[in-house]
């Protein structure tokens, strides 16, 4: 009976602890209705309304509990300048660090260099404001140990674009 009581108390206490604390104070991926409601169908960059790729988007809670959306966008049919410059979007409710670069509250586009598939070169990530001005640039290392790379994912405190990892803090 004593074990049952201790187990019950522990479950009640843990039920009241926010998920972000249980995620070792890291970036916690959010799914379900909260994810569905947070991902926009279109994203605005340089006067263009560009469709988002919900299947290649992630909603995370930061260690402080604020939300950040990372997602790829579909630039097919847009000018070559837009296609070459942008790959995705970031929408943030808080300041955070992306590979050592401070990203503020707001919405941003991002693009990257594309190293050869067999190359171990770093991938360069460029962050732009909605008017197209470059705000930051950083590099991500190739993680060959990644079992199942996808176009965009967040795990273990990193933003992954394919096999290239960019630190999140």
Question: Can you describe what each PLM-predicted range is?
Answer:
Residues 21-81, 96, 130-169:
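Primarily secretory-pathway and cell-envelope proteins
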Residues 14, 111-112, 143-145:
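Generic secondary-structure boundary signal with a strong preference for alpha-helix termini
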Residues 8-16:
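Bacterial N-terminal signal peptides
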Residues 17-18, 107:
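Residue-level recognition of conserved structural "scaffold" positions that shape functional pockets
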Residues 13, 27-31, 105:
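General structural signal for secondary-structure boundaries
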Residues 1-4:
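Positively charged n-region of N-terminal signal peptides that target proteins for export
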Residues 75-128:
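Mid-length scaffold segments of soluble, non-membrane domains
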Residues 18-19, 116:
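Residue-level signature of transmembrane alpha-helix interfaces in integral membrane proteins
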